[in-house]
Amino acid sequence: MATQIDASSEAAAATAAAQHTPMMQQYLRIKSEHPDTLVFYRMGDFYELFFEDAEKAARLLDLTLTQRGASAGTPIKMAGVPHHAVEQYLAKLVKFGESAAICEQIGDPATSKGPVERKVVRVVTPGTLTDAALLSDKSDVFLLALCVGHNKRGVASNIGLAWLNLASGALRLAELAPDQLGAALERIRPAEILAADGTIESVPAGMGAITRVPAWHFDIASGTQRLCDQLEVASLDGFGAQALTSANGAAGALLIYAAATQGQQLRHVRSLKVENESEYIGLDPSTRRNLELTETLRGTESPTLYSLLDTCCTAMGSRLLRHWLHHPPRASVAAQARHQAIGALLDAPPNAGLDSLRSALRQIADVERITGRLALLSARPRDLSSLRDTFAALPALRERVAEIASNAAALGRLEAALEPPPGCLDLLTRAIAAEPAAMVRDGGVIARGYDAELDELRDISENCGQFLIDLETRERARTGISNLRVEYNKVHGFYIEVTRGQTDKVPDDYRRRQTLKNAERYITPELKTFEDKALSAQERALARERALYDGVLQALLPHIEGCQRVASGLAELDLLAAFAERARTLDWVAPEFTDEIGIEIDQGRHPVVEAQVEQFIANDCALNPERKLLLITGPNMGGKSTFMRQTALIALMAYVGSYVPAKAARFGPIDRIFTRIGAADDLAGGRSTFMVEMTEAAAILNDATPHSLVLMDEIGRGTSTFDGLALAWAIARHLLSHNRCYTLFATHYFELTQLPVEFPQAANVHLSAVEHGHGIVFLHAVEEGPANQSYGLQVAQLAGVPAPVIRAARKHLAHLEQQSAAQATPQLDLFAAPPVVDEPECNEPPAATPHPALERLLELDPDDLKPRDALDLLYELHTLARSGPADAQR
């Protein structure tokens, strides 16, 4: 029965297909293989999109939607783009998270019966970009696969991640707990995520385009074997990945998908890196955001730490900088090696020094991405010429590095990495023209002298006229016919024309081609051979050039790993040179590391803020086992957040391997950096500002260790005063007694400044400011002890709060202070040392009621009184003063 149904379905499908034109049958077959992808169908000089694809493309790309004819009774909606401009349209689609299947003509229109044969040669998706026109120079694009592992009860126990930078071939794996997924995706920032239907809900919203792939692609055993096949190894033990489970399953799905989009093997994926949380200083999403490492809180690219540090001369160096900032190593060994290299670069002699080195680096091409395209056989002619010119410049660059490398082992390693693969430069020099055309189809790509046949075809095409003149001269001399002519027309091609009176002198090798009234036209074997070549010379030259170019690409494939080694060395050298330039220009110093717990910064400066202002006030920061928590008080805008952030940034820069903005700095081990700074709600997640604040605080309290650096800014401010104060006090105590981490704790709760009485490991510091008239001057200097005022009204005045509001606030503040002073049990003043209050005796009379004249006076705003009103008020106050509180109450 099932067989009958299948046969009926196939017959119905065949009948439906037969109603379409042959070309539309071909298109619909290809479209059925890529149902969720926009199909760019090559027709002559255009890529056409049909039906629903055309409607979507017209909307997204602002194309004209047309309708031409019908197929199977359905109007054919069309939209097209010129083939030479397709990359710019693909770039727009990728930004919208769309994918496109590029369908090319692979058959010969002259010999095809019916539609020209076509097939999809590549699929462009958000995570599989390799073309230079589709990529940002200074950031990587990652394709990530996610596989959820389950325990025996069917509960998610771990998550395996595999992510690939297809443009470079860098493959990484990780396995983590389910609650760590959001932080991992925030760090990796994949452009596209591959997941099976049952795991898509695990992916947090807004983390990249999600592509569904079959669940069987994530099979762990198959994934492990596929990784071994890809890396050409028998076991993954050498990469530390053999014992992984879900990560290997994710890698298998990723490799299947990536190879399918490219339509070929991934020859440049030759190694992998297993990332372990213990390798790097932990930076959660909140910390990355608050420290503005690569993006400001407003979502812009600058001013950030990345934009300040990125003076790299190559795109490779800029991308490596971004990676280093998000992956600071915990072990200080790597940072110390980088500091040593920076010192050697700064101390180098002028002829081989920093400026000379950076000048040479500016001539270097993006070897990393060119190598990726080379491995995928999609490198263009100018990619190869750029690679050739870079390899030609490497010997001089290596000499400069070698002169400096004796003082830094890291530079010695890089100098060795800069040796081009043997034979690669020679091949590129011989094969590729000095200034090749942008595309192979335009010709002029292969250098003269590389191939004799191509040179001859070019000569024929370019020097056809000269050949005919030379042949005519030779034939006149050979035959003695002075008026012999060699000519050409489109009907008969090339011929030798002899007048009737001279035909008796025609040699035996002349063959008659055409008889005219007064002349005979002949062809010779030499001319026939030339004709065959000349008439197709240009076409044949382009075909020969294409074949030779493909041969060059194939010949370069064995050099992929060598090119990757060179690219890695160039990127690191460029970044170290950029660090050295920043250190020299901005007066930064090499930090020191110690195994003892502590952070000591002498005259530290916020690197980004300092670059934005004319003068920056440097401050010290000292944290050690006897001084683990600094309670920071002071006015708003006084610099509390800047001081905290600069401490974290200086520590991060030190471990990344950069010099730091300070007079001196010394760091003990740091395993994580936490921040609880700023106020923002999560409307999409249904969380209030206070809930976000408490969630971040909970993560810190649960995860911080004695080696963690914690920044807490005004914790507890999102609720009532007493709730907030109680929470802030309890959190600070917990950080001191349980976490015992390095902590910078900024607060406006002055009651917290009593914490050092109970915990000697806490200390008070404040950001100084002085009043000037009704205004305030921020000194931005960190001084010992608590602040004595909040300066809230002065800051509000600076912010432009209207004067009547400021006056009303000042009156109400005086009223509140008066009430507080009159209370039997006074509340602690916000920014004054707590008074010593004697216990009242039992027979002590109650506190006096404030005098009505004083209360009335406090209600006044003298600036709003007219002369007559002031006089009336004076009489009123006189009466109140004489009557007293008791009379006023009556």
From Swiss-Prot:
GO biological process per UniProt: mismatch repair
Domain of life, source organism: Bacteria
Entry's Gene Ontology cellular component terms: cytosol
Pfam hit, one: MutS_II
InterPro entries reported in the protein's UniProt record: DNA_mismatch_repair_MutS, DNA_mismatch_repair_MutS-lik_N, DNA_mismatch_repair_MutS/MSH, DNA_mismatch_repair_MutS_C, DNA_mismatch_repair_MutS_clamp, DNA_mismatch_repair_MutS_core, DNA_mismatch_repair_MutS_N, DNA_mismatch_repair_MutS_sf
Gene Ontology molecular-function annotations: ATP binding; ATP-dependent DNA damage sensor activity; damaged DNA binding; mismatched DNA binding
Claim: ATP-binding is one of the keywords in the record: yes
Stated role: This protein is involved in the repair of mismatches in DNA. It is possible that it carries out the mismatch recognition step. This protein has a weak ATPase activity.
UniProt family annotation: Belongs to the DNA mismatch repair MutS family.
Name the record gives this protein: DNA mismatch repair protein MutS
Species name: Burkholderia pseudomallei (strain 1710b)
Organism taxonomic ancestry: Bacteria, Pseudomonadati, Pseudomonadota, Betaproteobacteria, Burkholderiales
